Amino acid sequence: MKPRDRQILQIALPSIVSNITVPLLGLIDVAIVGHLGSPAYIGAIAVGGMLFNIIYWIFGFLRMGTSGMTSQAFGKRDLPEVVRLLLRSVSIGLAVAFCLILLQTPIRQGAFLLIHPTDEVREMATLYFHICIWGAPAMLGLYGLTGWFIGMQNSRIPMYIAITQNVVNIIASLGLVYLCGMKVEGVALGTLIAQYAGFLMGIVLWMHNYGRLKRFWEIKN
């Protein structure tokens, strides 16, 4: 195998693994509530998960755009621009996330007008949504981080983060549901914990692997 092909595979394979793990967060939640005895729980998680899939898909440009521009700056060895791109993408992600939190009620109401869930599903999905929406800063901030890592030709860190998120989600959700007696709120809190665990892990790994770039820590127009 040519060195160039090997380099491409080293970047592509971890990204493939990361993408495979993305749907697992929602599937894990559905699997857990499926044992609670009522199909309404599954419906609530399905509705809530669908809403967040749409929301985060809309803002997927944070990851893809950051990846492309970072790879260009990294190829030019423009390290100040590389760092500025990280700061900009994470800042935009956090700003958008806080707007989503402020607008969570009209977003949820508008979505339910289109979906028309039953009253029981609506009540549980509302609880799930209003807990998980607080994970938006972690998710959108992580979009910026993972896009930046990939642009730096390091797709292993996003893979490690994705795997860790799923493991934390399984442990936290199972513990909250079966040990603490929670139901939909336990699954939502487990997802929330996993999201912030992934975001914090991304920050720690950035500091460990790229902390030397802090000397370029500035934002220019």
Which functions belong to the PLM regions below?
Residues 42-102, 139-157:
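Small-residue-rich hydrophobic transmembrane alpha-helices
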Residues 8, 42, 155-159, 187-188:
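Alpha-helical transmembrane segments and their helix-entry boundary regions
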